[in-house]
Structure formats: structure tokens, C-alpha cells
Amino acid sequence: HGVVRHVGTQYMADVSRDALVVSVREGQVEIDGRFHQGRAREGQQVTLSGSQQPSILSIDRSGREWAWVARRTPAADVDGKTLHEFLVWACRETGLRLQFEGNAEAVARDTVLRGRIDAEPAEALRLRLATTALKWRIEEGVIHITDETR
């Protein structure tokens, strides 16, 4: 069906006898098909099927179909790094967007982490945040971090 080249990304490709399906979580993927060429961007799923025009759908960046990423992600070595750095890592690995509210970003940048948690990113996120003064919730693919002390 074609050649797929990623450009600094997280993506998955599924090839069957009838189609090539490329889903992009982060970054972009160049697709060079037999009949069509193009680029799939973050949050898109492109399907090439023979000489038909490519089909482009919007997709979520997190969820069941991306669970394999978390299973393959090594534990983050965050000893001596900030909570902010950890949150950026965890969001990338889970496909969530990060949104700070109130003074939470300053707290995250000032909080230095110690130790290591050998867990998948979502579980590491839950365990790390349980030890901080920050509250968090996930809504529609966004993790909202708020300062509990306010």
C-alpha cells in the first residue's frame, strides 16, 4: 500500500490486504502510497485503500487503542527532577494534554522528586501526585492540575 515515515512522533500503522491505516498520536507521519501521498498529523487517522481518495478521521490521543505505548514505556528516572518534568513525561506517554490551574505550575516547577516508581505512566502519575499538595482530574483527554493549598 505504501511507505510510512515518521517525523518525531508516536503513531501506529495497521496493514491489511485491503488498506493501510495510520493513526498519529503525536507529531506527523509522511505516507507515500501507490496512488496517493500525504501527511497525517497529530490526532488524525488516515486510511489508504487502493486508488480511492484517502480517508481522514479525527482520533483521540489517549485511550484503549494506545495502551500498548504505556506497556512498552520504561519507568521514568525522575530522581532529582521536578514534578513539572515528570508531568510532561507522563502526559506524553499517556497521550493526555497538561493544563495547570491557579498556582499549580509554579508548585510543580519547584517540587523536586526523589526515588523511582516502577509503574506504567498512568499508575506512576497517580502515585506521584498522591504525595503532593496538588489535586488532579482527567477530563476529555486533559489532565487538570490544581493547587490544593489555595
Where are these predicted regions, by residue range?
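A residue-level detector for the "anchor" residue at the start of short, highly conserved motifs
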Residues: 1-150
